[in-house]
Amino acid sequence: MKHNDKQEKLAKAFKALLKEERFGSQAEIVTALQEMGFENINQSKVSRMLSRFGAVRTRNAKMEMVYCLPVELGVPTTSSPLKNLVLDVDHNGALVVIHTSPGAAQLIARLLDSLGKAEGILGTIAGDDTIFITPTSDTDIEELYLSALELFEQTP
């Protein structure tokens, strides 16, 4: 089997495993891939693959921290369980701050950035579990705060 074919099969198997949203550690992924016949796989290869495919750690339906792939097509919507990843929304008169489950901030920020200036969002900065939302110059911060609360079905 050619090297490229092996790499393709490994990538396909890797993505399939992450879509199951049940692997909480790189060691678990290594074991699963080895059981699938990829005997030369190790933790460092899995780590590189996680980075290459943009995998993130987030909570699954059972509230376990697991590796998963970001949504590959389109921008996430609030009808998906993303709203469940938002823990708190607040503001200080200048910025709106959103606290999320660990690993979820960049995904939520992507959604907010897609709303853009029409919704009063100049831009976002996201870490692992915190997002800063900068309003446009003509946006009232209180209105942006209330919009964010409504978007993620939070109460003030």
From Swiss-Prot:
Pathway: Amino-acid biosynthesis; L-arginine biosynthesis [regulation]. One of its GO terms (biological process) is L-arginine biosynthetic process. GO terms for molecular function: arginine binding; DNA binding; DNA-binding transcription factor activity. Keywords: Amino-acid biosynthesis, Arginine biosynthesis, Cytoplasm, DNA-binding, Repressor, Transcription, Transcription regulation. It is found in: Cytoplasm. GO terms for cellular component: cytoplasm. Coiled coil: none annotated. The keyword Nucleus does not apply. SUPFAM superfamilies: C-terminal domain of arginine repressor (SSF55252), Winged helix' DNA-binding domain (SSF46785). PANTHER family: ARGININE REPRESSOR. NCBIfam families: argR_whole, PRK05066.1. Belongs to the ArgR family. Regulates arginine biosynthesis genes. This is Arginine repressor. It comes from Aeromonas hydrophila subsp. hydrophila (strain ATCC 7966 / DSM 30187 / BCRC 13018 / CCUG 14551 / JCM 1027 / KCTC 2358 / NCIMB 9240 / NCTC 8049).
